[in-house]
């Protein structure tokens, strides 16, 4: 005779089954806006999805359970937030207000880290994507109101909430607030402040034309089954007892994209669609030891990315601001050597592959990059500053992070900026 199950065991087994069913339902449902490109789906039918292994599920669970400080401005206290907590509160409140959440996903570098932490890239921001319908302005406003209201729940005990308004919370804890509403893109982003750069970014997506630059950052991990398991089961997860968690590659073929991540390969689709920041990510990957796939037309890829960079950031002030923000986010603190190497690589790529600018505009940008590179070089200490040089990049574009430097001549910084078109006398 089989031993009878206790009530707790029955609930736990049901939780695992429900979690698995939830993952299957979300993964097999028709993709909401912002999913893989239809061209990728037709090229790789069914291959854009894959189940996570037990070690990957463990890493995901640990990442969602790790408290992240949300730093307040002025006298506002620091909030300690577990990602799974804020996801559950935001999701349940949106559902109560009548806005259905199709799925919640972990996206970007954090998802890549869960799948393969040995890539060397690590992660900064925690990108959490809520698939919702944003058909009206009221839906956009609701997502913002819900996120701001949920911050009240995470205020430390003893803090008076009586006079705290949503506007006050936005000024105190929101790093960035973005709304995009066009024919092809309907989404909003709320980024919560963290002084170390590990911002919690809540993105509400109805439709978006492209959510990745290269195959290695195209991963999304569907969190619904894991979150449901945590709510329903009192038994800790184990290799023999855990929910099915599904990953998706917006690039197309999940297995191929994961192999690119493991072997440090740079690959993409439709490079003409990559936004301006893709150029900086490309140079970052080269410095980290990634290589373009052998079949890649590197010159064409670089020309596309340079052109898009100058379309998205047309003037020198925007270029400086974009470069400084990217470098601070990815090469902060004591990583001056790699920051310098990234700027050297960017200088080379812009010099070789920019075809859309007049000569003086191109020279201005190169001077800006050179000035930032020399600043990063000086931060490495007297030995590096005395050498005042950098090792030239190899044929693969990689610049070693080292103080054995080699100088290349650069144009002196221009004292004056010129308009795009010089006046005709």
UniProtKB/Swiss-Prot annotation:
UniProt GO BP: mRNA stabilization; negative regulation of apoptotic process; negative regulation of cell cycle; negative regulation of cell population proliferation; positive regulation of translation
EC number: 2.7.7.19
Effect of residue 275 to A: Loss of polyadenylation activity
Consequence of changing residue 201 to A: Loss of polyadenylation activity
Low complexity compositional bias, start-end: 15-31
Main enzyme class: transferase
Entry's Gene Ontology molecular function annotations: poly(A) RNA polymerase activity
UniProt name for this protein: Terminal nucleotidyltransferase 5B
Organism: Homo sapiens
């Amino acid at each position: 005779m089989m031993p009878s199950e206790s009530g707790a065991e029955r609930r736990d087994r049901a939780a695992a089954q429900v979690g698995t069913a939830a993952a299957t339902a979300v993964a097999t449902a028709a993709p909401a806006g912002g999913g893989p490109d239809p061209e990728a789906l037709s090229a790789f039918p069914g291959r854009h999805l894959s189940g996570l292994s037990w070690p990957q599920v463990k890493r995901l669970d640990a990442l969602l359970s790790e408290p992240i400080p949300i730093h307040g401005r002025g006298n506002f206290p620091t909030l300690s937030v577990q990602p799974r907590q804020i996801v559950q509160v935001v999701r349940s409140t949106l559902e109560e207000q009548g806005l259905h959440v199709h799925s919640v996903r972990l996206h970007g570098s954090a998802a890549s880290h869960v799948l393969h932490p040995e890539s060397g890239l690590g992660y900064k921001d925690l990108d959490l994507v809520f698939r919702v319908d944003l058909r009206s302005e009221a839906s956009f406003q609701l997502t913002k109101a819900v996120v701001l209201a949920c911050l009240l729940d995470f205020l430390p005990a003893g803090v008076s909430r009586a006079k705290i308004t949503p506007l006050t919370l936005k000024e105190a804890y929101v790093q960035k607030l973005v709304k995009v509403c066009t024919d092809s893109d309907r989404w909003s982003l709320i980024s919560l402040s963290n002084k170390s750069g590990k911002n919690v970014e809540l993105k509400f997506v109805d439709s978006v034309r492209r959510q990745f630059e290269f195959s290695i950052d195209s991963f999304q991990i569907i969190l619904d089954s894991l979150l449901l398991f945590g709510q329903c089961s009192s038994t800790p997860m184990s290799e023999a007892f855990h929910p099915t968690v599904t990953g998706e590659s917006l690039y197309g073929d999940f297995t191929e994209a994961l192999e690119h991540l493991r072997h440090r390969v740079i690959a993409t689709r439709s490079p003409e669609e990559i936004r301006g920041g893709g150029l900086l990510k490309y140079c970052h990957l080269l410095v980290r030891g990634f290589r373009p796939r052998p079949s890649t037309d590197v010159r064409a890829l670089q020309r596309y990315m340079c052109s898009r960079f100058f379309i998205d950031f047309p003037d020198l002030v925007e270029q400086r601001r974009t470069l400084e923000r990217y470098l601070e986010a990815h090469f902060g603190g004591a990583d001056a050597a790699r920051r310098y190497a990234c700027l050297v690589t960017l200088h080379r790529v812009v010099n070789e592959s920019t075809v859309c600018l007049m000569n003086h505009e191109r020279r201005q940008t190169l001077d800006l990059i050179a000035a930032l590179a020399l600043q990063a070089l000086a931060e490495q200490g007297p030995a590096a500053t005395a050498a005042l040089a950098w090792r030239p990049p190899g044929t693969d574009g990689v610049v070693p992070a080292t103080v054995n430097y080699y100088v290349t001549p650069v144009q002196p910084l221009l004292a004056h900026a010129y308009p795009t078109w010089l006046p005709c006398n």
